């Protein structure tokens, strides 16, 4: 979104669009934002992350910043921290707030309510992702930057036609435990898919052309996927997450051999592995499963020799 008059949000001319997105995609983008806001407002423990880098040469803003800005201009409810919740921004302010006059002037310019306390919002931006895999991975890293912990569950709001790509490929590449449940019975990965309306001119062109590419190149390291990232990174931004989310450094930089498919799955430890919650590694988990959930007890003589 260009950030023009909020009254013209639904006009294609207010957006930087690809040709195939004209005539219907704008309404879908707005629905995605509305759905994200709705989920975040209902789940008081959630953080809404708008993800997307500076992919357009005609704009100085990132995709995520434009969505965040648009969310502020909408009349929908916004996800605020409750009074009983700690606001992370209060403990690590990077700079002093602007004085009142500057804040008011900036607020009017941005078409937002000058009384908003943005530091109390449970939503943020992830400004480096250049494709859907990075949307997934970098949003987790940004969640850690903002909260100091990793998410227990993730809800992705995107196009329905991209669902298989996220659920079958990206989650697998991240080894995210999609089918596991958190206390309360909620799955750790949920997907809300919203496509353009059936009569939209863009519908015939909405198909997942990237699925086959990610199926072969799960981390987007080669060929057309790498070329697309380079083309989209006109701002020449470098994501900081190897430093700011250090447990993910290996995964962020991981590139297996070309055409390795599943054989190239990232082998290192990840914060959502069983070890993180149980204290047990994969080998110990296997032993437990083989022995009915119990470790075999070895018996020792007084001199320390084991009875075999």
Locations of regions flagged by a protein language model:
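A structural signal for short, hydrophobic/glycine-enriched beta-strand patches
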Residues: 1-220, 288-294, 299-302, 307-308
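C-terminal accessory extensions appended to soluble enzyme cores
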Residues: 194, 198-308
């Amino acid at each position: 979104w260009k950030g023009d008059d909020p009254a013209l949000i639904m006009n294609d001319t207010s957006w930087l669009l690809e040709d195939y997105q004209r005539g219907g995609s704008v309404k879908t983008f707005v629905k995605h934002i509305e759905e994200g806001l709705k989920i975040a407002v209902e789940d008081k423990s959630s953080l809404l992350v708008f993800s997307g880098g500076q992919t357009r040469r005609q704009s100085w803003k990132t995709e995520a910043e434009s969505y965040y800005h648009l969310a502020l201009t909408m009349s929908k409810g916004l996800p605020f921290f409750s009074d009983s919740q700690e606001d992370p921004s209060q403990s690590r302010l990077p700079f002093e707030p602007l004085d009142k006059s500057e804040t008011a002037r900036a607020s009017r310019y941005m078409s937002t309510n000058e009384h908003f306390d943005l530091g109390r919002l449970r939503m943020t931006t992830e400004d480096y992702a250049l494709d859907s895999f990075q949307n997934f991975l970098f949003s987790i890293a940004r969640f850690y930057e903002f909260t100091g912990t990793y998410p227990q569950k993730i809800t992705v709001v995107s196009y329905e036609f991209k669902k298989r790509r996220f659920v079958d490929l990206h989650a697998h590449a991240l080894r995210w435990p999609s089918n596991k449940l958190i206390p309360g019975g909620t799955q750790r990965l949920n997907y809300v898919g919203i496509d353009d309306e059936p009569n939209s001119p863009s519908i015939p062109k909405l198909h997942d052309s990237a699925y086959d590419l990610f199926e072969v190149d799960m981390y987007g390291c080669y060929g057309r996927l790498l070329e697309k990232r380079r083309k989209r990174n006109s701002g020449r931004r470098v994501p900081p997450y190897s430093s700011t989310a250090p447990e993910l450094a290996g995964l962020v930089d991981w590139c297996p051999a070309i055409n390795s498919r599943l054989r190239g799955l990232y082998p290192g430890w990840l914060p959502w592995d069983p070890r993180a919650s149980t204290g047990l590694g994969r080998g110990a988990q296997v032993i437990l499963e083989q022995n009915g959930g119990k470790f075999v007890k070895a018996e020792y003589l007084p001199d320390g020799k084991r009875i075999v």
